[in-house]
Amino acid sequence: MEPNVRFWITERQSFIQRFLQWTELLDPTNLVLSIEKIEKSRQLLLTNEDASRGDLEDKRIQEAWKRSLSTVHPDNSRLIPGPFRPAALLPFTAPTLFLSMLPVKSLKSMILPQASFYTYSTAFNIVNGNASYDRRAHESLLLGAGVIVSSTFLGLFPRLLQVRLSMNSVLSRNFIPVIILAQLSGMNVIASRSLEPMRGIEVMDKEGNVIGYSRKAGTKAVKDTATSRVVLFGTSAFIPEVFAYFFKRTQFFLQNPWSLWTLKLSCTVLVMGLMVPVSFSVFPQIGRIQCNELEKEIQSATEETELFYNRGV
């Protein structure tokens, strides 16, 4: 069985345990691990099938799990490219999220931040989605391009209305864009991973044996991930806006107007730094689903009452 799958199936963790786990896996040093170190860690886990995260006495196994879980895709055992590993989400999206929420001066000034944000989000969702179903490279490229264009357009649309209609109320200027950003982040996951509910993803028993391909499991995997992304980006955009709203009423802001952008950027990074592990921990990495909720052909293929699938990140 793939070590990462074995880990997430056997380690039945609570939300708090998953959160603490992700704070380790999101260590920025995981972005620059050498292939040699990762391969050595994987070999150690493959030759020690009984190794668990609870082996506190063996620091080598602890480090091996950290490297494997943070760099290797559980479906195909391939290395995740550095820029799209879970630890890369914060440094790549926090700056573009901040720029996307700046006041609109002209529509042109908003195109690059929006396009950058949704380009990276789409690529991240595709790379870290479920990879157990059959898909061709050109399908992913065409799907990704379409999702990027549509997400960017929908993200720019409310900004266009602001410019054309001169909407300057606090609600339309600060909080409606947050709501739209949160919803588009969830829709981006659904669109970029739309092949999973269409073709079905692998479901397996507790030993890792593949029972079949389920469209219902694919739908649940995408829905749960989309929900977590709404929580992540909605909260990360909303809290800085609230802080900025009250900060602009202080004497300090009146004397130092430039400090507003420093506050918003710092707040965005801090909130995202907390919300990334929170959002990744809302649902287990390897999801569980009752067999009677799946397709008839899968129910007839096993006597297990509970099956597992990779939800993706």
Swiss-Prot record:
InterPro entries: Mtc. The keyword Ion transport does not apply. GO terms for molecular function: monoatomic ion transmembrane transporter activity; transmembrane transporter activity. It is a multi-pass membrane protein. The chain crosses the membrane at residues 87-107, 141-161, 175-191, 230-247, 269-289. GO terms for cellular component: mitochondrial inner membrane; mitochondrion. Disulfide bonds: none annotated. Keywords: Amino-acid transport, Membrane, Mitochondrion, Mitochondrion inner membrane, Transmembrane, Transmembrane helix, Transport. It is found in: Mitochondrion inner membrane. One of its GO terms (biological process) is mitochondrial transmembrane transport. PANTHER family: SIDEROFLEXIN, SIDEROFLEXIN-4. Mitochondrial amino-acid transporter. Does not act as a serine transporter: not able to mediate transport of serine into mitochondria. Belongs to the sideroflexin family. This is Sideroflexin-4. It comes from Bos taurus. The lineage of its organism: Eukaryota, Metazoa, Chordata, Craniata, Vertebrata.
